[in-house]
Amino acid sequence: MNNQKVVAVLLQECKQVLDQLLLEAPDVSEEDKSEDQRCRALLPSELRTLIQEAKEMKWPFVPEKWQYKQAVGPEDKTNLKDVIGAGLQQLLASLRASILARDCAAAAAIVFLVDRFLYGLDVSGKLLQVAKGLHKLQPATPIAPQVVIRQARISVNSGKLLKAEYILSSLISNNGATGTWLYRNESDKVLVQSVCIQIRGQILQKLGMWYEAAELIWASIVGYLALPQPDKKGLSTSLGILADIFVSMSKNDYEKFKNNPQINLSLLKEFDHHLLSAAEACKLAAAFSAYTPLFVLTAVNIRGTCLLSYSSSNDCPPELKNLHLCEAKEAFEIGLLTKRDDEPVTGKQELHSFVKAAFGLTTVHRRLHGETGTVHAASQLCKEAMGKLYNFSTSSRSQDREALSQEVMSVIAQVKEHLQVQSFSNVDDRSYVPESFECRLDKLILHGQGDFQKILDTYSQHHTSVCEVFESDCGNNKNEQKDAKTGVCITALKTEIKNIDTVSTTQEKPHCQRDTGISSSLMGKNVQRELRRGGRRNWTHSDAFRVSLDQDVETETEPSDYSNGEGAVFNKSLSGSQTSSAWSNLSGFSSSASWEEVNYHVDDRSARKEPGKEHLVDTQCSTALSEELENDREGRAMHSLHSQLHDLSLQEPNNDNLEPSQNQPQQQMPLTPFSPHNTPGIFLAPGAGLLEGAPEGIQEVRNMGPRNTSAHSRPSYRSASWSSDSGRPKNMGTHPSVQKEEAFEIIVEFPETNCDVKDRQGKEQGEEISERGAGPTFKASPSWVDPEGETAESTEDAPLDFHRVLHNSLGNISMLPCSSFTPNWPVQNPDSRKSGGPVAEQGIDPDASTVDEEGQLLDSMDVPCTNGHGSHRLCILRQPPGQRAETPNSSVSGNILFPVLSEDCTTTEEGNQPGNMLNCSQNSSSSSVWWLKSPAFSSGSSEGDSPWSYLNSSGSSWVSLPGKMRKEILEARTLQPDDFEKLLAGVRHDWLFQRLENTGVFKPSQLHRAHSALLLKYSKKSELWTAQETIVYLGDYLTVKKKGRQRNAFWVHHLHQEEILGRYVGKDYKEQKGLWHHFTDVERQMTAQHYVTEFNKRLYEQNIPTQIFYIPSTILLILEDKTIKGCISVEPYILGEFVKLSNNTKVVKTEYKATEYGLAYGHFSYEFSNHRDVVVDLQGWVTGNGKGLIYLTDPQIHSVDQKVFTTNFGKRGIFYFFNNQHVECNEICHRLSLTRPSMEKPCT
């Protein structure tokens, strides 16, 4: 029986019985005892024997018959899967009967026995609920190491890396001890440790730490060989993983690994190239597990991939290319033949592997014979199978899964028929590999003997530090038997806790009075107290345990919502003259640029309107889009715009609950008026937010006020009367509102001026632009710019050159000399048709004065407005803070007003919220300017809400492009055979930059369908981008607590992901972007990973028990035939609470212990890069005490070398880091002997 629904129902019944027994424990009836005995007697004798041996704790893992035998007889070639599958229903009935009879030892033995089989059915989560329930009912019940380790595997798959690391490190450090389990042999402990080391290697592989992962896999091989009888199954798995790692490993790392005197694998000595070594390792892996089809399928898939990659590399001699392709063909065919016609395939891992084998074989045929009709048909079938596979993996209905599984395998059968896959003759009909794969299994794969325990000692520091992070007391002391030796039990391993001691919103959120600001010091104490309290929470014999068990299942059966920390309370520690915390109740604001905060398109209006659901977020730690002011007196000059206020109604505020923060003086927000002009304009009050349901074209405005005040009301304005002596509108509130909208600002669309700004009131005073410089504002076309409050954008070295653009359909436009606009219109988002969508409330840095060539906020005083590059852009001109311009009398109709922005706020990053018409900001992922070199535009029909656009990803355009330009873009998007060869072999940044230069911008890729794609990985060590052909399915948007403003995130499943059962997230920009946005994101993240790897080594050398990891990121270039249709970045899904430790300018959160390590890492990156780079903008997942493991993502890098993206401030950013964030070296810096540089403020 392998029907998932039936299995799930039976397991649910077992869980319900346990739940009832946990609530009340009646005496066991004679009827229950006899039913238990009856069910056990009905089992086949082989299963009864296995249950008895499991009860006696005879082995820590249920062994295959062939697993430890050198000479395998006919009776040993039966797989355990077949035996368990045949009697599964009887076993589960016996499990229920044993629970009712209160024979927890027998029940735990059955759980142990069926564990691996149910993992293949994707229902391990429900089985683990039963195991935990047994432990809670009778804590002395032995729970097998295999079952405990299963929890670690599922945690890795679901993104709970901290949880998995703790379980594995506990077992390794405690010599395999878990609960009351007793080992019969010392070698069994070695086996458990070897498996744990192997899974830790897979975690590092998932994190892109190829060399370090390979070292751990090698260690596991040593452990398996150290057993009295080598574990062939363990060796097969480790060799396959090692080969898979070699595929991604750089040549330099491979040479280092190969030449390491402690690593003595013989297969490394036989081959010079890492891909050939990997292929041989897979051949050996398949031979070791020749009687288990899934193991063979996995191994030969990796072998075929290795040979495919090698045939495309520059190292492969041309005369040997076809030979290796034929070997790859054989490997994929062997994999496809592991499925017999009458055998069902019921698990995601096996289905994925079959689709991958079919695609690999199709790719080989294309390389050998070209794009024939047969190959094209097979390619289409593979994409069809990928779509069905994704639906299978996300479906919760057993009938659907069963039908989809059959459909997938039916498609695979068609591929086999198209490509004429023929079975091979084999003397041993039970073997799934050909005779040519046979080798002497007693062949030494190690030169000499490795000392496994000595190897473990080298990792003991890491395992100890991870264990120290978490509590080890069992939460169930109530029913503990006095004579039971509990040891390290599964409850102590935190298997019932969704998020282990990560810094969370619930731990950090203090109770705040509605109208009272809270000081930074008080808040810090509250946070520490809550962390201490939360870190010592023990689960009792109560509902809390059962609820948490349900949470574990959700992570396996279907993609769960993100659990992110955007609602967490953050405290700001600032150097300089700035005062303490400025807490704003901005539940719609997100303090990071990670994929944890990306948009999920649901209508959350009702949520926004609900009171009492506010999350406190420190808006001052957002990453800025432009620099902060050096001090209050050094504001930039602001240019005036001549436009007319048009159809704007302001509502009268209700200021009953508005009070200033205890730590901040009440500030007024002057509005900057402008001279009248005949063109209609746009007005925005200071800190205004866009209201829901506003009329089309003009939205209501809600006041946000300065961010360093605290308030909890919703002021709105029905009218605004102006007073010349006040410099601001009467009745205008000066406090932030608490709605869950996201911040935005309005930019008038007008051509850039010559920037001849005169000093009207002396230094630091802005002046109006002359009448001749008045620019147009387009009717009913406000440009809603979403300042994401995330990453500051550089203002240096950005040329400002403009073409004149006339578009008759827009009506009368007054043109300026050298004028232009940025044709960077957003694409339509899934929720873009909703009126008055949410926007985040957040202050904007006053230093952001103009918009650069990518829509960046730039400093208008530092940058000339013209050059010869022909870039189109918008310009935003603002008044410096503190300066009050003269205000006209009551009429405001002839003025455009810009807000005076909060001075202690880092600014914004791009986003494209519903209702936005033009997005002029840049996201934290910086990019170069080449993709913005746009063609001239002519009149034509529009699509969506905007009058212009580049050529979109489907090959059509919103307006007509000149024929020649359109042809050039389409040609640039079409990859030629030579391009494919270069990409598959590996290319450098410069080649890729030039090749993609004229591809234009792209709409977001289409979801809910499978695409052909190129997977591109970047190695900082080799500085190469290497491609791999694959198929990707773009799934549903993620359900997240907070919407992102610049990118959408969605589930992604592709054939060549590192972890078949793992979850991956794709990120795509909401608005049309050029390809290089994604590529620079990945380059920057992998550069930060390169630096942090070296930093970790230094920490380890100094016995500092902390390790930092950057989540790896890759590119998927979406293709249709050979034409580029889009681009997304992909990274593993990490589950946990997300925190932001610093930004890329001056803000840093010193109350987190992790920040100390992060700042030391930034300092180290500066020294390690020979004073060229500093990694900043620290954000990710940290533990409560800042020790153990820290996972980071989305960094920024200030570099003196490259200015390819505007979030790089160069020398100025490095100055900010050492003078504002890392003011003094900490203990970590001293222990690493880091030298503090002498910093002088760079000229701007």
From Swiss-Prot:
Ranges of biased composition (kind: Basic and acidic residues): 757-771
Acidic residues compositional bias, start-end: 787-798
Documented effect of changing residue 233 to A: Impaired ADP-D-glycero-beta-D-manno-heptose-binding and ability to activate the serine/threonine-protein kinase activity
Result when mutating residue 339 to E: In an ovarian mucinous carcinoma sample; somatic mutation
Transmembrane segments annotated in the record for this chain: none
Signal sequence region: none
Reaction equations catalysed: L-seryl-[protein] + ATP = O-phospho-L-seryl-[protein] + ADP + H(+); L-threonyl-[protein] + ATP = O-phospho-L-threonyl-[protein] + ADP + H(+)
Molecular function per GO: ATP binding; monosaccharide binding; protein serine kinase activity; protein serine/threonine kinase activity
Subcellular compartments: Cytoplasm, Cytosol; Cytoplasm, Cytoskeleton, Spindle pole; Cytoplasm, Cytoskeleton, Microtubule organizing center, Centrosome; Cell projection, Cilium
Alpha-type protein kinase domain mapped to chain residues: 1017-1237
EC number(s) on file: 2.7.11.1
Residues annotated as binding ADP-D-glycero-beta-D-manno-heptose: 61, 67, 116, 150-153, 231, 233, 236-237, 295
UniProt keywords, alphabetically: Cell projection, Cilium biogenesis/degradation, Cytoplasm, Cytoskeleton, Disease variant, Immunity, Innate immunity, Kinase, Serine/threonine-protein kinase, Transferase
Protein activity control: Serine/threonine-protein kinase activity is stimulated upon ADP-D-glycero-beta-D-manno-heptose (ADP-Heptose)-binding.
Effect the entry attributes to changing residue 153 to A: Impaired ADP-D-glycero-beta-D-manno-heptose-binding and ability to activate the serine/threonine-protein kinase activity
One BP annotation, GO: positive regulation of canonical NF-kappaB signal transduction
Pfam families: Alpha_kinase
Compositional bias annotation for Polar residues: 652-675
Ranges annotated as biased composition (Low complexity): 713-726
Disease: Retinal dystrophy, optic nerve edema, splenomegaly, anhidrosis, and migraine headache syndrome: An autosomal dominant disorder characterized by decreased vision associated with optic nerve edema, evident in childhood. Low-grade ocular inflammation is common in affected individuals. Later in childhood or the second decade of life, patients have increasing visual impairment, abnormal cone function and loss of rod function. By the third decade of life, visual acuity ranges from counting fingers to no light perception.
Entry function: Serine/threonine-protein kinase that detects bacterial pathogen-associated molecular pattern metabolites (PAMPs) and initiates an innate immune response, a critical step for pathogen elimination and engagement of adaptive immunity. Specifically recognizes and binds ADP-D-glycero-beta-D-manno-heptose (ADP-Heptose), a potent PAMP present in all Gram-negative and some Gram-positive bacteria. ADP-Heptose-binding stimulates its kinase activity to phosphorylate and activate TIFA, triggering pro-inflammatory NF-kappa-B signaling.
PANTHER family linked: ALPHA-PROTEIN KINASE 1 (PTHR46747:SF1)
Similarity remark: Belongs to the protein kinase superfamily. Alpha-type protein kinase family. ALPK subfamily.
The name this protein goes by in its record: Alpha-protein kinase 1
Species of provenance: Homo sapiens
